[in-house]
C-alpha cells in the first residue's frame, strides 16, 4: 500500500488532477441535472422571448423606447453566458465576471421597466412584464454567483445538483497549500529504528584501508574480543523487544457528508460514505481529513464532501 505522501499514491494523483474526475467540455447534462440552473435559465429565456415579442409589437404601434432594444441584446448575451458557464462547469472561474455583467444588466432592465410599465398600451405592458421577469432572474443570479461557495443558501442549492462538487473547503480555517500534508492513520508504515552512536560502535573500523573491523585480514585484531561486524556484544545490540506504541488519534470534530463518496479501490487509505452520514474528524486543516465512520472504520475523506457541524 503506498504511503500517503508518496508520489505513487492514487489519492495524491487525484488531488493533483482535482477532486474526482470531472468531465470537460460543454454538456447540457449539467444544466438538466441542476434544478436551480434549469429553472432560472428556463425562466430567463421565457422572459426574454416575452420581452422580445412584445417589443416588436410595441414598436409597430410606435413610441417604443430605443434604449429597450439594447437591453434585449445585452440580456441575450448574459443569459447565453450563464448557460455556457453552467454547461461547461466554469461557474467558479467566471463568477466575478458573471456578477459584473448581470449587475449592469439589472440597471438596463429596470430602466426599461420604468419606461414601459406606465403606458396604457397592452403591448407596452407585456414588454414591461418581460423586463420585470428578467430583472427578477438577474437579482437571483447576482445573489447566487456573488456569494461564497460555502454560503448556506448556495450549499443548499448545490446539494440538489447531480454534477456539482462541493466547495474546496467547508470550514473557516485556512486550507493547507501542500498536497502532501495528508493525515497519518494507523495504516501508515512504522518509522525506521534509530540507533545511538554507542550502539553503532561495533560497525567502526580501525583501519582506513581495509573494510574489516580490527584491521586487515590476518591481523591480530581480527582474533581479538572486539565486537565484529554482525557480531556485536549483547550490550551493544539494539533491543527490538519493545514494540512501537500505536498512536492514538482523537476525533474532536464532527462533520456531515453533503455528497456521497466512493473510495478509490486502488487506495486502501480512503473510506466510502453516503450523503448525510455523520463522521468524526481528527484534523480539519488539510484537503484530506482523517475521519472515522460510526461503525469504527477509519481512513481519509476529501474535505469538499464534508461540512463541519
UniProtKB/Swiss-Prot annotation:
Subcellular localization, as worded in the UniProt entry: Cell membrane
Spans within the Extracellular topological domain: 58-66, 117-125
Stretches assigned to the Cytoplasmic side: 1-36, 88-95, 147-309
Broad class of the protein's primary localization: membrane
Keywords: Cell membrane, Membrane, SH3 domain, Stress response, Transmembrane, Transmembrane helix
Annotated Pfam families: SH3_1
CDD domains (UniProt xref): SH3_Sho1p
Chain segments annotated as transmembrane: 37-57, 67-87, 96-116, 126-146
InterPro entries, per the entry: SH3-like_dom_sf, SH3_domain, Sho1_SH3
GO cellular component terms attached to this protein's record: plasma membrane
All residue ranges annotated as the SH3 domain in the record: 250-309
Domain of life: Eukaryota
Topological type in the membrane: Multi-pass membrane protein
Biased composition (Polar residues): 169-190
Region (Disordered): 164-190, 205-244
Job of this protein: Plasma membrane osmosensor that activates the high osmolarity glycerol (HOG) MAPK signaling pathway in response to high osmolarity.
Family: Belongs to the SHO1 family.
Subunit structure as annotated in this protein's UniProt entry: Forms homooligomers.
Protein name, per record: High osmolarity signaling protein sho1
Gene this chain is encoded by: sho1
